[in-house]
Amino acid sequence: MDTIVIAGLGNPGSKYQWTRHNAGFLFLDRIAQLEGLSIVRKQFGGLTAEWERKGKRLVLLKPQTFMNLSGRSVMPALQFYKLKPDQLIVVHDEIDLALGAARLKQGGGHGGQNGLRSIMELLGKGDFVRLRLGIGRPPHGDVTNHVLGVFTPPEMEIFARVLDGALDMLETALDEGVPKAMSLFNNKSYLEG
């Protein structure tokens, strides 16, 4: 059975649960809710669950290392399952995408995202798929306060649609390949219901 690790990035603890930086955790929580899974197994310095879907074993991983050390959780998972970087999908917040947007990307740099930076440092490269969930830049002020800030209720309403759209995107990528999913979904906006 093919195995893919889907790492949703975020920070552990209730203090960070609804912050923009926890977009990856929120995405995995949405999958767990829809599929009747519990992401509670302690492995690889994180919490995991396995989702069997169409002949694939999908390991949902929420690193509990804090964002800046995400690679310390992702790398052991890849080693345990003997996987290559192209068998990894990282789901993360993206300040360079507006709230209401989600994009798939194959490879690339870290763009200042510290969780990606940590993973790339340990892998030695960035040849993995990223599912980028837009949180937008702050209109003015500190980026750190923005990413660690909690979604407002109107923002959360939009972000809930982003999560469902991103799940459609992920399922298409798994079933038909990343290029097909990118062509179908990368220009969609989830601002309106």
Curated annotation (Swiss-Prot):
Originating organism: Trichlorobacter lovleyi (strain ATCC BAA-1151 / DSM 17278 / SZ)
Among SUPFAM superfamilies, the record links this protein to: Peptidyl-tRNA hydrolase-like (SSF53178)
Site Stabilizes the basic form of H active site to accept a proton — annotated at D93
Location(s), subcellular: Cytoplasm
Annotated site location: Discriminates between blocked and unblocked aminoacyl-tRNA: N11
The name this protein carries in UniProt is Peptidyl-tRNA hydrolase
User: In which family does this protein belong, per the annotation?
Assistant: Belongs to the PTH family.
**Residues annotated to bind tRNA:** Y16, F66, N68, N114
For this UniProt entry, which residues form the secretion signal? none
Q: Does the keyword DNA-binding apply?
A: no
PROSITE patterns documented for this protein: PEPT_TRNA_HYDROL_1
- Molecular function, one GO term: peptidyl-tRNA hydrolase activity
Give the record's keywords alphabetically: Cytoplasm, Hydrolase, RNA-binding, tRNA-binding
Assembly with partners or alone: Monomer.
E.C. number(s) listed in UniProt = 3.1.1.29
Catalytic-site annotation from UniProt: H21 (proton acceptor)
Q: Tell me, what does this protein do in biology?
A: Hydrolyzes ribosome-free peptidyl-tRNAs (with 1 or more amino acids incorporated), which drop off the ribosome during protein synthesis, or as a result of ribosome stalling.
Q: Which GO terms describe its cellular component?
A: cytoplasm
Primary location recorded for the protein, binned into one broad class: cytoplasm
Top-level taxon in the UniProt lineage: Bacteria
Catalysed reactions, as listed in the record: an N-acyl-L-alpha-aminoacyl-tRNA + H2O = an N-acyl-L-amino acid + a tRNA + H(+)
Q: What's a GO biological-process term for it?
A: rescue of stalled ribosome
